[in-house]
Amino acid sequence: MSHPTTHEFSQYAEVLAALSDPALVPPPPVPVEGPPGASVAWLRGSVARFASGEAHRRRRALVEAELARLAPADVHRAASGADTRSDPRTRVVRGLAAALHMPEPERVAREVGAVADAYFGEDGGPGADRAVARLVALLAPGVVDDTGLEAVANRIGLLVQACAATAALVEAAGDGVPTARVLRDDPPVRVMRRTAARATRVAGREIAEGDEVVLDLGAAQQGHAAPLAFGAPPRACPGRAHALALAEGLLGRPMTPFARLHHQGKALLLPNAWDYASAAALAAEGFEAVGTTSLGVAAGLGLPDGAAATKEATVELAGRLGRGPFLFSVDAEGGFSDNPAEVALLARRLYEAGAAGINLEDGRADGTLAPVELHAAKIAAVKEAVPGLFVNARTDTYWLGIAPERTAGRLAVYERAGADGVFVPGLSDRAGIAALTAALVTPLNVLYSPAGPGIAELGALGVRRVSLGSLLYREALAGAVSTAAAIRDGGPVRGGALPYADVQALAPGDG
């Protein structure tokens, strides 16, 4: 009988192929001895991580349901202000346990710490087994049936898996280093192991049933856009957004009210206004925040859009919007300059006027894209000058039809520079959106398309912000023209106009 062969992969394409191959699964757990709920072996044999086939799908659904109960922003809130004197692993588990409303988060963290090393294959001894039994008793007292025990096992597994990987991310992302940079340059999970559940072929290599596959994520990740640390479908980490929010909270990085809207586990619909009245009317309708449309600002002044002609008008509009009781983000084209210091100065002016966010685009008026390094320098300069301003880094690869295949690479550079979110107008196909969200660390913003997916479906695909761009402004112009024409031609008027008093009431009343 032949012995299993060990295959080592260190190139990005082959590692990604191995992670995506359903035949390659984590090393199977050892057979369980003893009663259920009382050992590390039972835990490993009951969680999604070490399962395959139907058992994996069923257990993964349990984890997804657990995570669906809370938004990443809630995880960030629970982790913020944590006691920094304890070790990162304890802080990670305590923060996640608190967010999930588990009893005695401090005790849960202590017990998970005793289980973690044994869970990942090291010898934890009887102490680790006793810690598992205590966790089961604490999190599911009195539960003895198989279904209930499987559910609590996957709750514990969620905590254990967060323990090491998220703690490593927290340690590596200190001193203000963006987590996106860490995940691509120094991934916290550097090696993964898989076992072939059946014969398969990966990157031209024949892998027999039982063979071991060692994946060097650290070597494979260098210079590539999509982070490998969260795996790939069908076994991609379901808690990716929660882990990132947890790390940011533990690092003491505040999440502004505007940023929080991007971490609710669904898509934020951001309508775009062009003056105070339109912004105030949208806010009165219940929209949690508004953006501005550069086309509306420019056209209202008789100027071209995208030609860096409305810098002062944009600042003045921000000053007017800042008088209102609503959150708003400003479309600032490319920052109205190719000097990062000047863009940072503009960003500070907008922030001081009341803006919660800024859009910076890499498309130029001549139909070309700005050098990626230049746009990244603008982003970094803004984040250094105004850390509390949400920077939405836009790439126009799809909008201008210039090398859409380079979109993920450009966005990865912008994320490394510190972008809080990224925007890809013109991207509307479902497969492209799903592929891009898998490659990103920060929230994805797309432009609404009447021919594309609706808001709920975009949220399910991983989109976290949907802008309306100039649509409302163009609709308003069309409505004004059609109403005037109908009156002139004796036709019916559509009606539905806001009463004079309602429009008058939108003004903040401070002169």
What would you call each of these model-derived segments?
Residues 58, 71-168:
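Cytochrome P450 heme-thiolate monooxygenase catalytic core
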Residues 216-245:
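Cytochrome P450 heme-binding Cys-pocket and its upstream "meander" loop
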Residues 256-328, 336-446, 450-468, 475-477:
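Alpha/beta enzyme core
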